């Protein structure tokens, strides 16, 4: 529940910030009449992401067992790529995102008689990017943790992001976005490492990967996945009490370079924004 909550809080807050920045810029430049058009783009993006998520989830439920495992592995790999890209992309562009959005709004509203649709599509693509990232991560998370709690956590995270977005827009709160994205990004890298190890496990169960399947270690006597804390670790970080050598290797092969890249100072002009 906690991982879907955090991911949807982060992704939802990114989308809310995009919408808030666009709406504020439209009002500040005496173009508030276009805010309604902006919301059309937001709703279209939300509908696309929701529809795609439902379609993929319902379709894959009919797959045979091996194909289901293969699909789970592919989705996990896609989720790892998206989460990693999300972490480092936000780290790179967060300082300039406001200027980029304002320039995109100006460009959209200068396109002759079709500027309304241009604004709709600009907002649509900006919000849909965040939503599609969430779709693939949630598909991977729901496959690892079956039950009502992951969807509930995702909905609570999204609802919290919406509330925070409105408060930021109205000026009711100031949030240190630099610290928020820094610490959630670090957490997400550990989540992605667990997904990468889970992908190898899924490919083995699908019959595609049968190398290095010896048990690396057995922690069942110390931290069983049947215990409360073990269950939480499994749901959040993909913890396995008796992982294979290949799972442990993939976990380290992904996480160590990712952490090194993360702790290195960003290049000039790519530091995180401090607050909004």
UniProtKB/Swiss-Prot annotation:
It holds the Pfam family FTR1. It is found in: Cell inner membrane. Its main location: membrane. The keyword Membrane applies. It is a multi-pass membrane protein. The keyword RNA-binding does not apply. Uptake of Fe(2+) ions across the membrane. This is Ferrous iron permease EfeU. It comes from Escherichia coli O6:K15:H31 (strain 536 / UPEC). The lineage of its organism: Bacteria, Pseudomonadati, Pseudomonadota, Gammaproteobacteria, Enterobacterales. The gene is efeU.
């Amino acid at each position: 529940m906690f991982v879907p909550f955090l991911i949807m809080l982060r992704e939802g807050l990114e989308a809310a910030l995009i919408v808030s920045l666009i709406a504020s810029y439209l009002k500040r430049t005496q173009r508030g009449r276009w805010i309604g058009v902006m919301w059309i783009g937001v709703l279209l993006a939300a509908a696309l992401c929701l529809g795609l998520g439902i379609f993929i989830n319902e379709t894959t439920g009919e797959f045979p067992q091996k194909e289901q495992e293969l699909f789970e592995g592919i989705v996990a790999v896609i989720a790892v790529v998206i989460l990693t890209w999300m972490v480092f992309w936000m780290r790179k562009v967060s300082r300039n995102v406001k200027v980029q959005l304002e320039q995109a709004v100006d460009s959209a509203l200068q396109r002759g008689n079709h500027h309304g649709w241009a604004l709709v599509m600009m907002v649509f693509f900006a919000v849909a990017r965040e939503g599609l990232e969430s779709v693939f991560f949630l598909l991977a998370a729901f496959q690892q943790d079956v039950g009502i709690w992951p969807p509930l956590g995702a909905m609570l995270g999204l609802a919290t992001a919406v509330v925070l977005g409105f408060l930021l827009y109205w000026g009711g709160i100031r949030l240190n976005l630099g610290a928020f994205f820094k610490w959630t990004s670090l957490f997400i890298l550990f989540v992605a490492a667990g997904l990468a190890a889970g992908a190898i496990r899924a490919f083995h169960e699908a019959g595609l990967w049968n190398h290095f399947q010896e048990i690396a270690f057995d922690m069942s006597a110390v931290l069983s996945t049947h215990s409360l804390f073990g269950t939480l670790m499994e749901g959040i970080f993909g913890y396995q009490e008796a992982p294979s050598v290949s799972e442990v290797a993939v976990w380290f092969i992904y996480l160590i370079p990712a952490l090194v890249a993360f702790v290195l100072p960003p290049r000039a002009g790519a530091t995180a924004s401090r607050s909004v």
